[in-house]
Amino acid sequence: MYLRFGKRVCDIVIGLIALPFVLIIVAICAPLIYFEDKGPIFYNAPRVGKDGRDFTMYKLRSMKVNAPDLVMEDGSTYNGADDPRMTRIGAFMRKASIDEMPQFINVLKGDMSVVGPRPDLRRETELYEGDDGEKLLVKPGITGYAAVYGRNSLPWRDRLKLDVYYVRHVSFALDVKVFFRTFYVIFKQDGVYVEPEDGDVKEASN
């Protein structure tokens, strides 16, 4: 009952409450993003959502225009503290997680949920193994179980296992726990960036 009805109601309520804060953050960050390199304010990120459907995830742009797609050895997207692709304002937004705020619009549209597995790129879903694809049985989230219990400090495949755990145990109580732990994780700045070893990062092939 919660997964089919209650979760959507919670998403709409939280999305509407968050919307004014989203608009304020966009109003403050937009000129800083634009004047740093005269590029677009938003990055419309292609992602894979529930049931394997493609959707556009909205983000404030944190990287330089036409930045290459860097990947880890396991095929996941690189996200390091020394990422040369990030702009100065982008590094701050990424660390504070405010680049993700426009995703509340995705929540109101129904593409995403407030809590759920973080969405992957299409090329990443093609690397799923075993039960990994179960994460696509629910809507992706702005925050999620794997996002607050390890975040980017965990290897990608370990995060996938946590995503599958969430899908198999989703409940109102678990969502509340993840939601409030998100503030704790952001405040402590735990696991914001991945720590790759030499040679682990390469440019994705087209």
Where are these regions (language model features)?
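Short amphipathic alpha-helical interaction/hinge segments
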Residues: 68-71, 116, 191
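A short, structured surface patch at a secondary-structure boundary
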Residues: 63, 79-139, 179-182
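A hydrophobic, helix-centered structural microdomain
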Residues: 1-66, 172, 177-206
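Acyl-group handling in specialized metabolite and lipid biosynthesis
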Residues: 164-167
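Short, glycine-rich, amphipathic interfacial segments at transmembrane boundaries or analogous
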Residues: 41-85, 143-161
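Positions in alpha-helical segments
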Residues: 15, 30, 43, 87-91, ...
